[in-house]
Design a protein with these regions (language model features):
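Pyridoxal 5′-phosphate
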Residues: 2-393
């Protein structure tokens, strides 16, 4: 049976109609015998699901004596069965060799994060040739959001507004509000919210039409410094039209007089990564960040990923960034050199990888390391899964 296809970016009515049409087609393809709302039809769909084997790879919370139906992946993904063995292996290595674990296979801690960007690339839409310059895995989402804004939110007296959706996830609101205050501006005037025209209740979420977002951008374009939206709205489930909104921001920048500071477009993909198809490089997104413990099933509080388009990779003067030890290339990382600033300014690509300026080494004993080992680790499995599910999206 073919994967269900739906209209990701339409209105709520269009999306619902698209899903109903897809289910109706599946019902017909399945013979149409059992009612669409019957347990028998649901069981038949499960049996013909091309991804049905993946369920067995996870520990499913119990409901009574049976496996439950887990609908909480938006908060925390499930535990892959191989996690215990991988983490125990690293604990054994620590006990056996102490500091030698930094360089001992499998999973030497000094390099344990290096496989992750390539695995993330297909999930968020980055071509293999751009992985080195566009994707990094480090820190938490909020920390990465602050690091990205440290580089890209460069407010001036004339341009200091950040545009967000009104029902943005609280951590995003806290981050942008504190950035505005940090730069000496007032959130009352420098934070603009785009509301759903369908509801006055913030916690209802509500669908925000793409044209409403574009109208808000146009209305504030002379004051905007940054547009920061969720890729997928956590209350309403709306998958925002990332390519259209991003292209509109870039069109404004292209039409602006020479010397005008560009409006930056960034995306929080916490509820999108591993959930919906994305093509961040082709969409020309300036930056994005996401967590890994929801639909990527890495464990509570595990590492975040972030994307910066390759055109910004060496724009150090235009977008100065905060740096850290793990931003130094591996061959120089343990030489403990102190002339980093001079070397960075003279030849950044020789000293610092374009993006991987994590503040320090990654947490090698969190549940995350299972994703850096051989299959069937969850993130390794996502690549073929994404090709099978999203190839026509």
């Amino acid at each position: 049976m073919e994967p269900l296809q739906s209209n990701f970016h339409g209105s709520s009515e269009e999306t619902t109609a698209s899903v109903v049409a897809a289910l109706t087609a599946l019902h017909a393809a399945n013979g149409g015998g059992d009612a669409m709302d019957s347990a028998a039809f649901a069981t038949a769909l499960d049996a013909s699901d091309p991804l049905r084997d993946f369920r067995a790879r996870f520990a499913i919370p119990q409901h009574g004596d049976e496996d439950g139906v887990y609908l909480c992946g938006n908060s925390l993904g499930l535990l892959p069965h191989d996690t215990r063995d991988v983490v125990q292996g690293q604990l054994d290595k620590w006990a056996r060799g102490g500091v030698k674990g930094h360089f001992e296979e499998p999973l030497p801690w000094a390099r344990c994060e290096e496989a992750l960007p390539e695995l993330m690339a297909e999930i968020v839409g980055c071509s293999p040739e751009c992985v080195e310059t566009e994707i990094a895995v480090a820190n938490s989402l909020s920390v990465n959001l602050h690091l990205l804004m440290a580089a890209f939110y460069r407010p001036t007296a004339e341009r200091n507004v950040i545009l967000i959706e009104a029902a943005a996830f609280p951590s995003d609101r806290y981050a942008v509000t504190s950035q505005i205050v940090h730069h000496g501006f007032d959130p009352a005037t420098s934070l603009v919210e785009v509301k759903s025209p369908a509801t006055a209740n913030l916690m209802d979420g509500g669908i925000i039409p793409t044209e409403t977002i574009i109208a808000a951008i146009d209305a504030n374009k002379d004051r905007l410094s940054l547009v920061l939206f969720s890729g997928l709205q956590y209350l309403s489930g709306q998958y925002f039209d990332i390519p259209t909104v991003t292209a509109h921001v870039h069109a404004i920048n292209a039409a602006a007089p020479a010397g005008t500071p560009p409006i930056i477009i960034g995306w929080d993909l916490a509820h999108a990564a591993g959930n919906v198809p994305m093509h961040l490089h082709d969409w020309n997104v300036d930056f994005a960040t996401w967590c890994s413990y929801k639909y990527l099933n890495s464990g509570a509080g595990c590492l975040s990923g972030f994307f910066v388009h390759e055109r910004h990779a060496t724009a150090y003067e235009k977008h100065p960034r905060l740096a850290g030890w793990w931003g130094v290339k591996f061959e120089k990382r343990f030489k403990m050199e102190h002339k980093v600033r001079a070397l960075l300014l003279l030849s950044p690509r020789l000293v610092f990888l374009p993006l991987r300026t994590a503040h320090s080494s990654p947490p090698s004993l969190s549940p995350t390391p299972r994703r850096w080992t051989s299959p069937p680790a969850q993130l390794v499995s996502f690549a073929p899964t994404s090709r099978r599910c999203w190839s026509r999206a």
